Design a protein with these regions (language model features):
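Short, conserved acidic/polar surface loops in the N-terminal third of protein domains
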Residues: 90-94, 152-153
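Predominant activation on well-ordered alpha-helical scaffold segments within soluble catalytic domains
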Residues: 28, 62-66, 100-107, 120, ...
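ATP-binding N-lobe of GHMP and related small-molecule kinases
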Residues: 1-90, 108-112, 145
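ATP-dependent small-molecule kinase catalytic core of the GHMP/sugar-kinase superfamily
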Residues: 115-183
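DPxDG-like acidic metal-binding loop motif
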Residues: 92-116, 143-145
Length: 183
């Protein structure tokens, strides 16, 4: 199983460039090999789970897992189970955490795992499919942890650094939801 953290993005002047992984909340994504060369989502539980599709072609974890399998040329499929700890539409990277979790969980099953940067790209493609734009400011820190800076999207280049241990973050979440496409 993979634990994939909530993230903050669009920090200061770093629109679609800066991202920061939080310690919590987080999603947990479990993956297992299946003989059919497809991705299935067996279960989603947790806050807002009833609003999240189990269709792997429309779910960010399913799309990211498929992207990993295709990039690696895997000869098997993946069944996913998702435990949401991050409420959807909360503004702290819920779909990005699921995408990162799907990519990383599928990667654990490969005989030759992909590089971290490739996982970020697979997760960003899932975000593109669900939100409408290719951006890695949430999935980057969800995959890599820490603070990330995207140096370039073409060609893709991302850098990770540890934030200062003295840095504290307070996240306030109002009790209403905003879909990323509408934000």
């Amino acid at each position: 199983a993979v634990r994939s953290p909530a993230t903050l993005s669009n920090l200061g002047s770093g629109f679609d460039v800066f991202g920061l992984a939080l310690r919590e909340p987080y999603d947990v994504v479990e993956a297992r090999r299946i003989s059919d060369r497809k991705v299935v989502i067996e279960d989603i539980e947790g806050p807002g789970a009833s609003s999240i599709t189990t269709d792997p072609t429309r779910n960010s974890a399913g799309i990211a897992a498929r992207a990993v399998l295709e990039l690696a040329g895997a000869g098997f499929g993946v069944a996913l189970r998702i435990k949401k700890g991050i409420r959807p539409c909360s503004g702290i990277g819920s779909s990005g955490a699921s995408a990162a979790g799907g990519a990383c969980a599928a990667n654990l099953l490969l005989d030759r795992p992909l590089r971290s940067e490739e996982l970020v790209v697979c997760a960003a493609r899932a975000e593109q499919a669900t939100s409408g734009s290719f951006h890695a400011d949430n999935v980057g820190p969800a995959v890599l942890g820490g603070f990330t800076v995207i140096r370039s999207y073409e060609p893709f280049e991302i850098h990770r650094m540890d934030p200062p241990v003295e840095l504290g973050v307070v996240v306030t979440m109002p009790d209403f939801l905003v879909n990323t496409r509408e934000a």
